[in-house]
Amino acid sequence: MKNNQEYILVVDIGNSYTKIGIFEKEKENTTSIILFPTDSETNIATLSKKMNVFKKYNIKHSIVGSVVPKLKPTYFKTIKKMFNIEPYYISETTKYSFLIDESPNKELGDDLKALCEYCVSVNKNCIGISFGTAIASVYLKNNSLVGASIAAGLGFGLNKLIEKASLLKKSKIDKFSSDFFGTNTISALESGINNLRSGFAYNFYNQAKKDNLNSDLKCIITGGESYNINISSFEYEINKEAILLGFKKIYFLNN
């Protein structure tokens, strides 16, 4: 056992990747975190090996968010077996620090609800943008969810393009490139990735700002692809763990 400090285990199961982190109950920085590809056929034995790194911590709380519903029972059983606690799951009766209408409450993914929760902890007027398998954004006005926008992710689109273009199949694309203008096919693709990231954030922010001209609108950017965002027209915060933190906040709001 690491110490007597209580920890919360937070699980975010995405379509492509699963991220698991632990936090001290009273802190917002992750103590330990693991990331691995989501496997719809995973089992208790496999998960137990992955999460064994957390056994040394005094884990007394847990929340599991998932956009892959079939995996929830496996995670429930694994966490209960390893830590002797029952994880909390988001449901239609879950309370939030923001207002959400009935329809989006039923349809919006757990991860985006967690992003909303983190956003309103920063400011009552806020947009959150997640760059991952999908590009997703949420807009909150006066602590109320106005709406969201979802598009195919950069990695998915790039992989499909490389599959179709024979000249690109042996080329290495640097998704971390910050160049705005490409001088050949590869650097042009790298420029496109950079401009798509920054352009999506810029446009979504501006549309929200038009709807809320007199507010101090904040912008939170997160997700595995949230790097090299080049925007000078407004301030933004990049927090890779915003969604995990949102789940943590949801847990303690409901328990």
From Swiss-Prot:
Keywords: ATP-binding, Coenzyme A biosynthesis, Cytoplasm, Kinase, Nucleotide-binding, Potassium, Transferase. Gene3D superfamilies: 3.30.420.40. The keyword GTP-binding does not apply. GO terms for cellular component: cytoplasm. ATP binds at residues 12-19, 133. Its main location: cytoplasm. The active site is at residue 111. Coiled coil: none annotated. Belongs to the type III pantothenate kinase family. NCBIfam families: baf. PANTHER family: TYPE III PANTOTHENATE KINASE. This is Type III pantothenate kinase. The gene is coaX.
